């Protein structure tokens, strides 16, 4: 059995198992097998520096840099940061901060008939997503080359021109000290007119702006589950995580938090990625 087929089989098995509480030993065993396959493939790869093509879970993926591709692969497939369960065979998914589309492939491996609306401000990353979609004849995917904000218009996107495949691009200079290009900015609430099964929000520092927009417009009421990558202390010493959690609590969400490694003794105000897994109570 090929790695891609094996990984896809495990992804389907995860979908069938259901919630974390009900999985028990079967899910734990499947999880260990899934991670073992994924990490084996991650370490085995010897891709060119990039750009290039990679085989991922039975799909062909267009990437811009091999190292960043492996980094995204580890987050999305090996660590399953965006795994979710739903009874809807055609879930509506918002992928905010798509980069090269690794999560799009993960969602399609879980739910082949999913309807995915993706947002990515970097035009070169959007081109890579388009190539991946065409190479795999994928359907049900709409890609918007735009940043997400509280107000529509345009924003500066800061990026590293030496590393076009980097996952660290932002409209906030505190997050990326690089060159700037102008990109269109839209409000996510415009695109939330019907129930959304899952929202992935990884927008490099704009997550509060998006949540405020969803809350003020009432669109947050349409969302059933979400994973938010909150960039804690992106501006050193500025504490805003409580606002994120408060918005969720006020709109009927419970949540679990996972955070990146903390080194001791801690450094006050140190940057930290915090994953917020939010679900309807």
Predicted regions located by residue number:
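Phosphate/nucleotide-binding beta-alpha loop and adjacent structural elements of enzyme active sites
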Residues: 1-281
């Amino acid at each position: 059995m090929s790695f891609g087929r094996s990984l896809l089989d495990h992804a389907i098995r995860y979908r069938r198992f259901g919630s974390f509480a009900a999985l028990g030993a079967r899910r734990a065993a499947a999880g260990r097998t899934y991670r073992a396959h994924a990490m084996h493939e991650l370490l085995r790869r010897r891709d060119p520096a990039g750009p290039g093509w990679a085989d991922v879970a039975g799909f062909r993926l267009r990437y811009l840099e091999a190292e960043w591709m492996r980094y995204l692969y580890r987050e999305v497939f090996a660590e399953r940061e965006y795994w979710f369960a739903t009874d809807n065979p055609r879930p509506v998914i918002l992928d905010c901060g798509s980069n090269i589309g690794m999560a799009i492939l993960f969602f399609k491996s879980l739910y082949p008939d999913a309807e995915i609306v993706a947002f990515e401000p970097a035009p070169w990353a959007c081109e890579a997503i388009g190539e991946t979609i065409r190479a795999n004849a994928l359907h049900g995917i709409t890609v918007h080359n735009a940043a997400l904000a509280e107000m529509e218009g345009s924003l500066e996107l800061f990026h590293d021109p030496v590393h076009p495949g980097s996952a660290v691009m932002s409209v906030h200079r505190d997050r990326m000290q690089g060159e700037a290009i102008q990109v269109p900015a839209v409000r996510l609430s415009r695109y939330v007119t019907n129930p959304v099964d899952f929202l992935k929000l990884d927008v490099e520092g704009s997550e509060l702006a998006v949540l405020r927009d969803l809350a003020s417009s009432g669109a947050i009421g349409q969302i059933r589950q979400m994973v938010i990558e909150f960039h804690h202390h992106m501006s050193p010493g500025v504490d805003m995580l409580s606002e994120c959690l408060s918005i969720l609590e006020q709109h009927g969400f419970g949540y679990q938090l996972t955070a990146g490694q903390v080194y001791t003794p801690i450094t006050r105000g140190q940057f930290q990625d915090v994953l917020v897994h939010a679900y309807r109570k």
